[in-house]
């Protein structure tokens, strides 16, 4: 998902070496096998027993890189960003073959930074949240090749204050949706009974780019969601965040 790190947070920005190794192993295994690894896969492939893996998964969850049922003996992986074990509208396809579900529209763009996609053509297949008409993004390596006039709109039906400080990634992803255009975004918001903020695909892609460029490459890729920094990030790419600011004003009113 998209985020800006707060410099004021005490949360370290760098993964421990073992956490960095584990998330890289999980993503590569998932890409190669079309599924997340289980505890035996992690033990044989990365060398971490279940006690160590549980501790590392908790570190990855706090750094917004994974969602794991760490209270379960099997340590079931729900998400390892950008991949999702739960079916979503967004599918990564390579040579016509399904690779993995992606968590949300933000991950439909940030997936482009994965090293295993360098130098190949692939697609993200999705659909409009309003009418279920198909949406398709085409890539070559990190480059989005879909013409601008064919890109979908993004409807955001949550507020950054709902996403910050340890909220799991799958909860954040649930607030981001592709729609065919602004009119479909408005109808989607009406249908689910929420106000939506509307943004362009290019804006979300720009927000996702710093994350995508660092994933599996830079150990300083740990993130910490902070509402103010997040809103400033959206504003920096031209998104109208007046709706969110109005909610801030309401919250501070006496």
Feature locations, PLM:
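Short acidic, hydrophobic short linear motifs in intrinsically disordered regions
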Residues: 32-45
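Short, cationic-aromatic polyanion-contact patches
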Residues: 13-19, 71-95, 141
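Short helix->loop/beta-hairpin flanking segments within DNA-binding domains
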Residues: 21-35
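Short alpha-helical segments that sit at the start of domains
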Residues: 2-24
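A short, conserved structural fragment
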Residues: 61-73
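Short amphipathic alpha-helical interaction segments
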Residues: 47-62
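Short, amphipathic alpha-helical interaction segments positioned at domain boundaries
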Residues: 79-117
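Long, low-complexity, charge-rich intrinsically disordered regions
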Residues: 96, 100-107, 117-120, 130, ...
């Amino acid at each position: 998902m998209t985020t800006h790190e707060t410099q004021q947070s005490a949360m370290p920005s760098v993964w421990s070496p073992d956490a960095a190794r584990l998330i890289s192993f999980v993503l590569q295994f998932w890409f190669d096998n079309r599924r997340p690894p289980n505890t035996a896969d992690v033990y044989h492939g990365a060398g971490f027993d279940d006690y160590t893996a549980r501790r590392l998964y908790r570190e990855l969850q706090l750094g917004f890189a994974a969602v794991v049922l760490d209270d379960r003996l099997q340590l079931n992986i729900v998400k390892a960003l950008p991949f999702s074990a739960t079916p979503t509208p967004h599918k990564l396809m390579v040579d016509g073959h399904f690779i993995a579900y992606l968590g949300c529209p933000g991950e439909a763009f940030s997936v482009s930074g994965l090293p295993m996609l360098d130098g190949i053509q692939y697609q993200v297949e999705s659909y409009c949240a309003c009418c279920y008409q198909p949406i398709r993004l085409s890539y070559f390596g990190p480059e989005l090749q879909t013409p601008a006039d064919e890109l979908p709109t993004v409807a955001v039906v949550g507020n950054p204050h709902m996403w910050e400080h340890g909220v799991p990634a799958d909860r954040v992803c649930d607030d981001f949706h592709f729609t065919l255009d602004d009119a479909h975004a408005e109808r989607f918001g009406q249908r689910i009974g929420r106000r939506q903020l509307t943004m362009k695909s290019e804006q979300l892609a720009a927000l996702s780019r710093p994350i995508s460029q660092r994933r599996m490459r830079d150990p300083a890729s740990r993130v910490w969601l902070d509402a103010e920094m997040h809103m400033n990030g959206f504003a920096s790419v031209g998104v109208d965040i007046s709706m969110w600011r109005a909610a801030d004003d309401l919250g501070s009113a006496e």
